[in-house]
Amino acid sequence: MRVLVSCTDGGSLKEVIFNSGTDTSVQTALQPLHVETHLEQGLNNYINKISQLSNGEFLIARSNGVVELVKATLLPKEYTEEPPEGKQFPSFDVNKFEVVDTLAGLLDNKRLEPLYQKSKKRTKLIDEFVTVTLLNEKLNIYILASKSGLIHIIKHNSKKSKLEKINSFEVKAPLDFAQLYDLEGKMDKYILGYGGEENLVKLIEINKNFTDLKQIWEAKNVKNDRLDMKVPIWPVSLKFLEPYKGEKLEKDKINYQFTTVSRYSHLGKYRTQHGRKPLEYKDLLPNREPLTQLEVISEKVTPIGNAQTSEFSDITFITTDTKKDVLKFNHDGRLLLKYGKGDILGSPTFITISKGKYLLQGGLDRYLRVFDINTNERIAKIYVGAKINYITLLDDDEIELPEVAKEKEKMKEKSKKRELEFEEDNDDQLWNDLDSIKHHKKSKI
């Protein structure tokens, strides 16, 4: 497996290459084959988001408001020391990274000042990127959204290896997420759902020329609780489902469905055909422990995590709290299991599902973990030495180890030898049978 890890402490990018079963917390277990630090820029310039492009390039968004176009080149792994006598080092390629272009000034802390200046209890809010997503593959157009409510449309010129800003928009801040709707084929518009602290979910539409942005829908808060207190608003993540297809479908109304989790441990299910309030709004945890992320599991999921089903009952989902838990729930909000229970010791600051089968997790305890979402078993655990902010899986290929290759060759030779011996035994038995038949005929005569 080959992954890229954003490490907050040094503002670096780490390439980690390993096989299934790797565990750095156990000395006798399999160890990672390669861990190397790249593009280190310090704590104030850590990497928020990573987006892999189609031609061996990456978009890397940093906390200082700079987006970098990074070129990756695969080169054979070089070793600085000789292998132990009678052994060989494994042979594989590693990446060399080079920044080829940048765009700066894409964040604005001043837009967040009104949200905390009037309160003595609030900490200062720092702007950061909440999404970097491919918008139009044919045109190489990407959308970037920030916590301060800035939405940028940029173009990747693959021939010149250049980044160009096409347009910028402003929406209500703060944003904890901005999720693109990608569940239909060709569309003449782009739909985005966003929200955050005291910022109810809103759906916006960007036209195909990227010249206009308008709000098309806004959620409404649920009714007050049993003490007639306002239910706090803080959606932290959203995933779309396919449009509603039931008998009550009204064709003249917009038709979108999505699910959310909130900072206050609420699960929300929304259908715009139903109205502005959620279809369901449930407490997930008894003490309303803060939740921070959302990933959905379904039979089919798009590359950016939206569920290719119109039924809420077809999905399960994974979320994280601010303590140490990675939690898996069914569609009704019933807790199914905790990933890494007893193993994760710090806040899980990042999770993502990759290739529809791997759960990648990292956080304050500085360990990269990979789980199989079908068996829920841990595949790998690797210490990277810094708080993890983002993880992306490049490939899940296993590296063949020389010792393993030799064992396989020995097993093949043994298997061939057994087959030859079996054939020789069969031949001997055949001749013996023929001799027996001849002898029997002669005795009769």
From Swiss-Prot:
SUPFAM superfamilies (alphabetical): WD40 repeat-like (SSF50978)
Main location as per UniProt: nucleus
Any one Gene Ontology BP term: rRNA processing
Intracellular or extracellular location(s): Nucleus, Nucleolus
Keywords, sorted A to Z: Nucleus, Ribosome biogenesis, rRNA processing
GO cellular component annotations of the record: nucleolus; preribosome, large subunit precursor
Highest taxon listed in the record's lineage: Eukaryota
Family, similarity comment: Belongs to the NSA1 family.
Subunit structure: Component of the pre-66S ribosomal particle.
Function description: Involved in the biogenesis of the 60S ribosomal subunit.
Protein name (record): Ribosome biogenesis protein NSA1
Organism: Vanderwaltozyma polyspora (strain ATCC 22028 / DSM 70294 / BCRC 21397 / CBS 2163 / NBRC 10782 / NRRL Y-8283 / UCD 57-17)
